[in-house]
Regions:
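Family-specific functional microsites
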Residues: 1-145
Length: 145
């Protein structure tokens, strides 16, 4: 199970329709092709999703919470998101997809709140939201008697 919003975001990734800064610049919605958060790197899809150090901190924290004995490199995360293939060390892929989908949604929302409304990209708040949202999806509801 994944939220409809997370599915929509993931669909945009899979079909190559992520609204990157260089595209937004071409249509007059941005003045720069640099990443809005780190302001030092050109924003391509890899950087937008996982390569930005600010966003990567969120990924590292959330994935470390749910998979403390595994390491996910930037390339590994990018491959999972763009091809829906995961490492053989993952024994429950649906669990991983929920974690990634929920975290992706939180980072996506944080990115656009920051970019459009000048709301600070608060990493720790996004980590908490991603963990809480993932646990909400993965924790079964108690059965009524």
């Amino acid at each position: 199970p994944m939220t409809p919003e997370a599915r929509t975001i993931w669909y945009k990734i899979l079909v190559g329709k992520v609204p990157l800064r260089h595209f937004l610049r071409q249509i007059g919605r941005s003045t720069s092709s640099l990443c809005h958060l780190c302001t030092t790197s050109f924003e391509d899809t890899l950087h937008f999703l996982v390569g930005c150090p600010t966003k990567n901190d969120v990924w590292t924290s959330v994935l470390g919470y749910f998979f403390p004995h595994l390491h996910f490199s930037i390339d590994c995360l990018y491959t999972i998101m763009t091809t829906l293939t995961w490492p053989s060390t993952i024994w429950n892929p649906s669990h991983l997809l929920v974690v990634i989908g929920t975290t992706l949604r939180c980072i996506w929302n944080g990115h656009w709140q920051s970019s459009i409304h000048n709301v600070p990209f608060h990493r720790q708040l996004l980590v908490k939201r991603a963990i809480r949202g993932t646990l909400h999806i993965l924790t079964p509801l108690p059965l009524d008697d």
